[in-house]
Regions:
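...captures the hydrophobic TM-helix bundle architecture rather than a specific catalytic motif
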Residues: 1-180
Length: 180
């Protein structure tokens, strides 16, 4: 029978009540490779999401400056109508999808959800880590679409028809955006 209502963890003379068992420390990797590349810690992944979202947000900020400069002083920046429309499209997708979604869901979500539920980590840490690397790949493909012939898609940031119809849309197509 348990002493004081606790079930004994170890039977015998050295019985320790279950509520007095100290939590064990998790293994903390020491190298950069295991600490940041293959890390499955939700807080490290949250910092990675946040830094990536802020970096892509700076690209969106520069694109908003270019848009406003083109509106305020037409012709100062050598940009035709299709390039301007592509810039507006990429600015909208960067700010809404790649900045806000990643910062709030990936950054704050990974950092705060384990604290709110009282857990040490997320439920599927490997999938959580993999989702960040897929997001980073999508960001790199999105940025590389500026450098392909024809430029990025110019379908409007909502990607609704009739702007999203590829025959009338400037740019290299919708496949280069990789919205994951």
């Amino acid at each position: 029978m348990a002493a004081n209502g606790y079930e004994d963890v170890v039977k015998g003379d050295d019985a320790v009540p279950a509520l007095e068992v100290q939590p064990q420390e998790l293994y903390h990797a020491k190298s950069f490779w295991t600490r940041y590349i293959f890390c499955q810690d939700a807080k490290v992944i949250a910092v990675q999401y946040s830094l990536t979202a802020i970096a892509i947000g700076l690209v969106g900020l520069v694109s908003s400056w270019l848009i406003r400069m083109q509106i305020a002083y037409p012709g100062v920046i050598p940009m035709d109508a299709s390039a301007y429309y592509q810039l507006v499209t990429m600015h909208g997708m960067i700010m809404v999808i790649y900045l806000l979604t990643a910062l709030f869901l990936g950054g704050f979500g990974n950092y705060l959800i384990p604290l709110m539920v009282g857990a040490r980590d997320m439920v599927f840490p490997y999938v959580n880590m993999l989702s960040y690397w897929v997001f980073l790949l999508a960001v790199l493909i999105l940025i590389s679409s500026y450098f392909v012939p024809g430029g990025p898609t110019g379908a409007g940031w909502t990607l609704y028809p009739p702007q999203a119809i590829t025959s009338g849309t400037p740019g290299s197509g919708l496949g280069i955006t990789l919205m994951i």
